[in-house]
Regions:
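N-terminal leader/signal peptides at the extreme start of proteins
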Residues: 1-9
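A broadly tuned "polar low-complexity/structure-edge" signature
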Residues: 9, 17-18, 22, 81, ...
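C-terminal juxtamembrane segment of a hydrophobic transmembrane alpha-helix
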Residues: 16-17, 21-44
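N-terminal export/assembly leader peptides and their processing motifs that target proteins to secretory
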Residues: 33-149
Length: 149
């Protein structure tokens, strides 16, 4: 019968396993915080782009009613990822709608412009889908923007 002598070969493979685990641990400790930061920034970008797109739907509806004249009406369906307050202002020449977003690092104001200059309203929209009515009545001189329930 032949005796097989392993010697210290088992210890060598155990050292390789332990050293590779330490390297993987160090790499994960460095890469996970970087990955989480990148995910936060990408979520902020997605929220900003989505908010700008949804705000543009509302301002396009205001422009449509303004261009169509009295008696026009448009209903817009918007979808926001969070609760928002839309402020409709004007600077004397043209109007603008703005949303204040709280991002991961600071606050940012998203703005979209429209041609009508008589709106001064604030609309609260809840997270999810909301229906917005933009109408210009025949007997009114102001375009009305309100949330439909």
């Amino acid at each position: 019968m032949k005796i097989i002598n392993i010697g210290n070969k088992g210890q060598l493979s155990l050292e390789y396993i332990l050293s590779s685990m330490i390297v993987i641990l160090i790499i994960s400790l460095i890469s996970i915080p970087i990955l989480l930061t990148a995910m936060d920034y990408s979520n902020d970008i997605i929220d900003s782009i989505n908010s700008k797109s949804e705000l543009s739907k509302i301002t396009d509806a205001i422009d449509f009613c303004y261009a169509s004249g009295k008696g026009s009406k448009r209903i817009v369906l918007v979808d926001f990822n969070r609760n928002v307050d839309i402020r409709l202002h004007n600077d004397g020449k043209r109007g603008f709608a703005s949303i204040n977003l709280n991002l991961s690092d600071d606050s940012k104001e998203i703005t979209s412009y429209f041609d009508c200059n008589g709106l001064n309203e604030k609309i609260h929209l809840s997270k999810g889908f909301n229906r917005i009515a933009v109408k210009w009545d025949d007997d009114s001189n102001v375009i009305e923007v309100k949330r439909l329930i």
